[in-house]
From Swiss-Prot:
It comes from Nitrosomonas eutropha (strain DSM 101675 / C91 / Nm57). InterPro entries: SAM-dependent_MTases_sf, tRNA_(Gua-N-7)_MeTrfase_Trmb, tRNA_methyltr_TrmB_bact. It holds the Pfam family Methyltransf_4. Keywords: Methyltransferase, S-adenosyl-L-methionine, Transferase, tRNA processing. It comes from the Bacteria. GO terms for molecular function: tRNA (guanine(46)-N7)-methyltransferase activity. Substrate binds at K135, D167, T202, K203, F204, E205. The gene is trmB. It catalyses: guanosine(46) in tRNA + S-adenosyl-L-methionine = N(7)-methylguanosine(46) in tRNA + S-adenosyl-L-homocysteine. PROSITE patterns: SAM_MT_TRMB. Catalyzes the formation of N(7)-methylguanine at position 46 (m7G46) in tRNA. This is tRNA (guanine-N(7)-)-methyltransferase. GO terms for cellular component: tRNA methyltransferase complex.
Length: 224
């Protein structure tokens, strides 16, 4: 029997580390990172309190992640990212903002959701501007696929939300189809949702808008 390697939603590049990112990656990961493990973790004991838990998949350089966490001290946030300079950048921002409600798991989100987060434990999941993988032969690498959305749904509490934003029209159409096909999810809008106040406009997004790209938000809730 041949076993196929898993299809990844990312390619690990060497990437350029700024001095601050490298320093943060090396010195702050033990403080704000949650190491990958094949065993379930208890987020309430990691944060030292019971509070709503929001997961962000693919936090990139962490600008949005930190802004949202700083504006919502009443909630706890867990970011998942695989790109080392991005992890360093987020760690540096957590330290500079003195945030106690944001941690990062530096690993593949699929494995984190399968092994570390169990049960219906999340109040919300953010996936902002996932890699679009525009070529047809790469579509299988897209994060938003029915199996993955089913896994996300398993981890959401009843009434919890899944929020995706993208500036790629065809990825938005694909995601709308996949989310609408998951029976446990209910669209909060007729199709795309207005950008909620908690999602700040990023520089990347403002640049896209100048180029005429339309940003689409999809916000679905899990049936109670
Ligand atoms: C296009 S970037 C968007 C970053 C950020 N959300 C933003 O809006 O600027 C997508 C990010 O998702 C990360 N990513 C892709 N697949 C992932 C996975 N399976 N687990 C964790 N991170 C992933 C990539 O490393 C990349 O940083």
């Amino acid at each position: 029997m041949s076993s196929h390697p898993p299809i990844r939603s990312y390619v690990l590049r060497q990437g350029y580390f700024s001095h601050a990112q490298r320093h943060a990656y090396e010195s702050l990961l033990p403080r704000y990172g949650i190491p990958f493990s094949e065993n379930p973790i208890d987020l309430d004991s990691i944060f030292g309190r019971t509070a709503p838990k929001i997961l962000e998949i693919g936090s990139g350089m962490g600008e949005t992640t930190v802004e949202i966490a700083a504006q919502h001290p009443e909630k706890d946030f867990v970011a998942i990212e695989v790109h080392a300079p991005g992890i360093g950048s987020l760690l540096d921002r957590i330290e500079k903002h003195g945030l106690t409600n944001l941690r990062i798991i530096p690993h593949d989100a699929k494995l984190v959701l399968q092994h570390m987060l169990t049960g219906e434990s999340l109040d919300g999941i953010h996936i902002f501007f996932p890699d679009p993988w525009p070529k047809a032969r790469h579509h299988k690498r897209r994060l938003i696929q029915s199996d993955f959305v089913s896994l996300l749904c398993n981890r959401l509490k009843p009434g919890g939300y899944l929020h995706i934003a993208t500036d790629w029209e065809d990825y938005a159409i694909h995601s709308l189809h996949v989310l609408s096909s998951e029976q446990r999810l209910i669209n909060t809008a007729a199709d795309y949702a207005p950008r909620p106040a908690y999602r700040p406009l990023t520089k990347f997004e403002q640049r896209g808008m100048k180029l005429g790209h339309t940003i689409r938000d999809l916000i679905f809730t899990k049936a109670a």
